[in-house]
C-alpha cells in the first residue's frame, strides 16, 4: 500500500465532535487516508465531563491531547489558555506531520490551531465559515480562521457569498450543507 494522506481533525468540545463524527468515521474507513485526532479545549476540562472519552468510546484513537489550562472565563485567562494551546498544537503538529488539518466553527480554543497551520504552512480546511453570530467574539474568530484557511466548507450559499466578499476564492469554497443535519449519531 502506498502513502496515505494524514488528515488531522481537531475537536475542542462535544458540540463540534457531534458534527465531525461522520467525517471522522469516513476518514477512518478510507483506504487512502490516515485519520489523526487532536482533542483540546473543553474536552479536557473536568467540570465539563472530560468529554474526550466520548471520542474514545466511539472507537477513535486520540493521537494528542492538548490542554488549554484555562483558569477562568476572563479575557486574560482566555488569552493565556490560547497561548498554552498554541504551543501544544505546534508540538502535536511536529509529531504528527499532517497533510491537512480540519477544524469546525468559531470557538476560541480552535483558533490557535488555525494560527499554527498558517505559520507552519499546513493546509487548513475550515467547516462552517462565513456565518454570523452578532454581538459575540465568535465572529472575529470565525472570520480570522476563514482568512487563514485554504479550503472552506460552508452550510449555505449565503455563507459562501460572504466568504467571497471577504476575498476568499470561489474555487476554494464548497457548500456541503449543515453537518448538524448530517452528523446526528
Regions found by a protein language model. Name each.
Residues 133-150:
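A conserved, positively charged/aromatic
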Residues 91-107:
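Short N-terminal targeting/anchoring amphipathic segment
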Residues 44-46, 148-185:
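A nucleotide-sugar donor-handling region in carbohydrate enzymes
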Residues 1-43:
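N-terminal subdomain of nucleotide-sugar transferases
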Residues 102-119:
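An aromatic- and histidine-rich active-site surface loop
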Residues 35-81, 88:
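Conserved nucleotide-sugar phosphate-binding/catalytic loop shared by glycosyltransferases and other
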Residues 116-130:
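Active-site proximal beta-strand in glycosyltransferases
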Residues 9, 37-39, 103, 126, ...:
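Structural beta-sheet core signal
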